[in-house]
């Protein structure tokens, strides 16, 4: 599948459904993205006397084998005083929330949930940025209908300078639909281990430029995944009716706690509810094993959902009147409201499909039984 140079140039100037160069100057836009990123990177560089270990790794080390952070083990880190901002500074005070989908076993459907939730957010009038951090073998671009994926590894070289410029970010982006833009994975899986710093810089920019950031993760956590999970405002622990789903989910929750995510920011997401073998009892066992106060159930989409996702039609999947689409829309709206997003009414597509009658069927050229042919 082609990467980078094979993609038409007209798709390269759009992120979140708008033109970056023309329409993001009134906010802290990409035109000056180098300066804020450079300042943020300087603040995060290890100072003399400080450890060069990432913040999430410091928390894991402090937690030790118990997984608990004692108050005495975390010493306050002195924060240098920030320079006074001028009166005309236009830096937004609010940063977009980050929603990470994690799981302890593959095949539970978290990529489908991320893809459909991103489209649901766009139907609510939000600009959704999507990161596929299954860097080696992720296929979120397939589920979102991208024909020619861009290589996220192009961010490795510019990130060495401590900042990402607008052309670098746009080149690695894929405009999926108005309000939905995707980054990732990498074309060469062996470059995945080099993506920690680029992902941190990209995530910092996207939190300023978008309304919500959705992150799909891999079962194996590298530095990039751990940093994204540590920065998340909501961690979706996804599982299904598989035998090992509940056990692996509880282990993921423990790891997320050790990298700094409190359990109050986690939600137990039981996927494919209502399918064969995924009844109320199985869902309750999963939720009890997770022991989280926030619970979400996503209804089974069946073969109809599988057919749509196989052709990259996640937008149609979330716009239907099926039980799956309804559960995704309701869960997404409730979560975004809790995270403080300014959600609007559902777009006309959802309203039209909600009132639309059943699709007319083709009348075949023969009569009913008993009628003359």
Predicted regions, residues:
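Inter-motif core of Ras-like GTPase G domains
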Residues: 222-242
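Well-ordered beta-strand positions
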Residues: 212, 234, 292-296
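Beta-strand-loop-alpha "switch" segments that mediate conformational coupling across diverse proteins
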Residues: 272-274, 286-316
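Acidic-aromatic/histidine active-site loop/patch
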Residues: 1-99, 160-163, 255-258, 264-266, ...
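Arginine/glycine-rich "motif VI" loop of SF2 helicases in the C-terminal RecA-like domain
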Residues: 122, 256-264, 287-292
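Cytosolic-facing regulatory segments adjacent to core modules
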Residues: 161-220
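Walker A/P-loop phosphate-binding motif and the immediately C-terminal alpha-helix
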Residues: 93-144, 206
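Phosphate-binding loop that captures ATP/GTP phosphates
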Residues: 121-181
């Amino acid at each position: 599948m082609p990467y980078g140079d094979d993609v038409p140039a007209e798709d390269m100037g759009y992120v979140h459904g708008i033109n970056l160069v023309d329409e993001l100057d009134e906010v802290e836009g990409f035109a000056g993205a180098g300066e804020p990123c450079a300042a943020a990177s300087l603040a995060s560089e290890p100072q003399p006397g400080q450890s060069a270990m990432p913040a999430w790794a410091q928390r894991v080390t402090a937690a030790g084998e118990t997984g608990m952070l004692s108050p005495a083990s975390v010493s306050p880190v002195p924060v240098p005083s920030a320079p006074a901002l001028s009166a005309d500074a236009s830096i937004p005070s609010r940063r977009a929330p980050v929603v990470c989908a994690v799981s302890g076993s593959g095949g539970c459907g978290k990529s489908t949930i991320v893809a459909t939730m991103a489209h649901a957010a766009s139907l609510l009038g939000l600009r959704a940025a999507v990161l596929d951090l299954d860097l080696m073998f992720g296929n979120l671009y397939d589920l979102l209908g991208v024909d020619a994926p861009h290589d996220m590894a192009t961010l490795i070289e510019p990130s060495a300078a401590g900042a990402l410029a607008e052309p670098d970010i746009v080149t690695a982006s894929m405009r999926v639909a108005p309000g939905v833009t995707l980054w990732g994975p990498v074309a060469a899986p062996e470059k995945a281990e080099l993506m920690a710093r680029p992902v941190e810089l990209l995530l910092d920019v996207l939190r300023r430029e978008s309304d919500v950031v959705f992150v799909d993760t891999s079962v194996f956590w590298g530095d990039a995944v751990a940093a994204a999970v540590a920065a998340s405002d909501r961690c979706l622990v996804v599982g299904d009716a598989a035998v090992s789903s509940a056990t692996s989910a509880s282990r993921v929750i423990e790891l997320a706690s050790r990298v700094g995510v409190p359990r109050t920011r986690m939600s137990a997401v039981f996927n494919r509810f209502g399918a064969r073998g995924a009844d109320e009892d199985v869902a309750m066992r999963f939720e009890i094993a997770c022991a989280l106060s926030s619970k979400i159930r996503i209804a089974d989409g069946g073969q109809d959902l599988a057919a749509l996702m196989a052709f990259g039609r996640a937008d149609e999947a979330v716009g239907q009147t099926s039980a799956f689409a309804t559960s995704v829309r309701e869960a997404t709206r409730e979560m975004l409201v809790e995270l403080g997003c300014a959600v609007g009414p559902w777009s006309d597509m959802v309203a039209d499909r909600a009132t639309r009658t059943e699709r007319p069927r083709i009348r075949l050229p023969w009569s009913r039984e008993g009628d003359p042919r």
